[in-house]
């Protein structure tokens, strides 16, 4: 069966820049400060200023570098930058020129960036000063001329976009290029404006093509649900203020900081890089009202001994990118003084396809109600719908789903059913009127025919006072080919002392027999994660498989 949202909306007939800068559906005024530097909020830009800078940068990208000259959706510009005030304007300027915004994580090496440059066919690179050398090295490997490597600096009241340390400052340009207004549904659905790379949790990253329709419907429908559900609740009519701390090379940061705040009518205070102590302080300094982040940040808040009243102005907290365990959710809600709702999605669905309406909450692991116009199914291995209460792979269809992977028809064909449903690879179950996420299909541990969720074991181990962080994967069983043994990779909390035997006993005393750590406990310094906070289990699985399985009779 299909699971439907509470209501549908008419598909928006407008392009992204029109939504951000001209449509009354966005709640910003001309004087609204859209983006400000957290360390110095006098360094900021208003909506009116952002529109002007967008048009000027669009002219620069078109006239100086030919972006969009042969039509929209063909020429990519790659950004490799820490968060900064004018990065959203660069994003909009690229789209305004008819180009495609793409981005590489600042954590990548020059060699990794060069692979992404080639795969995306990027023609220009925009880097922050700290990544200038990396961008040049990557460009050289790809044969991109050095004059097509631009450096953007917009923190500390510096406003520069130039070729390295010299040459013309393109931010001083005055000529403008207005963007093309698009109302045709076909063009909105099929014009790629954003090329973001999947997190690579289960394999090499792939370029996910996102259109005007994808980004506009995602941002707009989420806000419309919230607006509809807060009618009659005047205490919820608070200004939108948040701290920009997520990487913008990923959908959570790109959508959540470039687009959503402008539609919601508020301000992003930008941190160039995440630091938990500074983040907590900024949340108080700017009386933050909205927080959307990943479980590692909530984990940092819970572990901090500095939290007092820094989150007293918070009215809405959301978690995404990875499942939030019940234990961590309850601890974080107590610290924040605010309920946390889980949202669920992925790059291929333009971020989250669920959101929690005002006045509702959940602490059962539910992923929040489906967004308007989306459709969801739960299926078995043969793509047959499962019965209510049975686990199944989640399939999606709707305006937020990508058309596919850039220049990768094989991966695109594999990701979709023949009738157009996107196969998420996530396992869920419909229970008590809610969809509950169980785990990634490829990450479930198979122990003697039973499926074990790493997330459940991780959430429990994080309640141990000596555990700072943990990831669980399946290790090979040397005595039973094809069988997997749960193994925990553990980061010990500073100043604590904990043994493998102690953690095994902790799990044994509280979890079912098939969830025991028969694969052992390995202590490491850091859990490998993507820039968006997802555990890179494939790295740990490779480590586990390269070593002999260690079975303990429990």
From Swiss-Prot:
Q: Which InterPro entries match?
A: AMP-bd_C, AMP-bd_C_sf, AMP-binding_CS, AMP-dep_synth/lig_dom, ANL_N_sf
Q: Is Amino-acid biosynthesis tagged as a keyword?
A: no
One MF annotation (Gene Ontology) recorded for this entry:
CoA-ligase activity
- Pfam families noted in UniProt: AMP-binding (PF00501), AMP-binding_C (PF13193)
Q: Which keywords label this protein?
A: Ligase
- Write the Enzyme Commission number(s) for this entry: 6.2.1.-
Q: Which domain of life is it from?
A: Eukaryota
Q: Which parts of the sequence bind AMP?
A: 195-206
> What does the sequence similarity comment in the record state about its family?
Belongs to the ATP-dependent AMP-binding enzyme family.
Return the protein name. Putative acyl-coenzyme A synthetase
């Amino acid at each position: 069966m299909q699971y439907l949202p509470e209501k549908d909306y008419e598909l928006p007939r407008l392009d992204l820049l029109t939504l951000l800068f001209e449509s009354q559906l966005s709640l910003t005024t001309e004087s609204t400060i859209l983006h400000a530097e957290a360390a110095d909020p006098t360094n900021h830009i208003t909506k009116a200023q952002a529109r002007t800078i967008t048009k000027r940068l669009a002219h620069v990208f078109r006239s100086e570098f030919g972006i969009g000259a042969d039509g929209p959706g063909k020429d990519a510009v790659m950004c490799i930058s820490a968060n900064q005030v004018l990065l959203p304007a660069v994003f909009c300027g690229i789209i305004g020129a008819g180009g495609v915004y793409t981005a590489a994580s600042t954590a990548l090496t020059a060699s990794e960036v060069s692979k992404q440059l080639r795969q995306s066919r990027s023609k220009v690179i925009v880097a922050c000063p700290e990544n200038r050398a990396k961008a040049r090295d990557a460009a050289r490997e790809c044969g991109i001329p050095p004059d097509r490597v631009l450096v953007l600096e917009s923190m500390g009241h510096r406003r520069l976009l130039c070729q390295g340390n010299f040459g013309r400052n393109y931010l001083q340009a005055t000529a403008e290029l207005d963007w093309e207004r698009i109302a045709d549904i076909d063009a909105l659905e099929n014009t790629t404006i954003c090329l973001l790379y999947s997190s690579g949790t289960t394999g090499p990253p792939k370029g996910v093509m996102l259109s005007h329709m994808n980004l506009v419907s995602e941002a707009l429908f989420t806000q419309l649900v919230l607006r509809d559900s807060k009618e009659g609740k005047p205490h919820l009519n608070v200004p939108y203020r948040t701290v920009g701390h997520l990487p913008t090379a990923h959908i959570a940061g790109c959508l959540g900081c470039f687009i959503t705040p402008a539609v919601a009518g508020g301000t992003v205070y930008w941190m160039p890089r995440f630091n938990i102590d500074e983040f907590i302080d900024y949340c108080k300094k700017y009386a933050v009202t909205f927080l959307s982040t990943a479980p590692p940040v909530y984990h940092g808040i819970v572990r901090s001994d500095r939290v007092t009243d820094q989150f007293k102005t918070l009215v809405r907290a959301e978690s995404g990118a990875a499942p939030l365990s019940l234990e961590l959710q309850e601890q974080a809600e107590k610290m924040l003084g605010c309920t946390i709702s889980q949202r669920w999605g992925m790059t291929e669905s333009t971020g989250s396809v669920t959101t929690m309406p005002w006045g509702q909450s959940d602490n059962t692991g539910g992923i929040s109600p489906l967004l308007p116009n989306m459709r969801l199914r739960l299926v078995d291995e043969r793509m047959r719908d499962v019965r209510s209460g049975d686990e199944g792979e989640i399939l999606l269809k709707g305006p937020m789903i990508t058309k596919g992977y850039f220049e990768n028809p094989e991966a695109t064909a594999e990701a979709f059913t023949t009738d157009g449903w996107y196969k998420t690879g996530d396992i869920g179950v419909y229970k008590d009127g809610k969809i509950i996420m169980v785990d990634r299909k490829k990450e479930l541990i198979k122990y003697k025919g039973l499926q074990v969720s790493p997330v459940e074991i991780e959430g429990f181990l994080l309640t141990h006072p000596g555990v700072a962080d943990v990831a669980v994967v399946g290790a090979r069983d040397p005595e039973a080919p094809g069988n997997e043994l749960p193994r925990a990779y553990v980061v010990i909390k500073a100043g604590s002392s904990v043994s493998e035997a102690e953690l095994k006993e902790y799990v044994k005393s509280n979890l079912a027999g098939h969830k025991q750590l028969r694969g052992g406990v390995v202590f490491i310094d850091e859990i490998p994660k993507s820039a968006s906070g997802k555990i890179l289990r494939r790295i740990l699985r490779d480590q586990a498989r390269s070593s002999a399985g260690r079975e303990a009779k429990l």
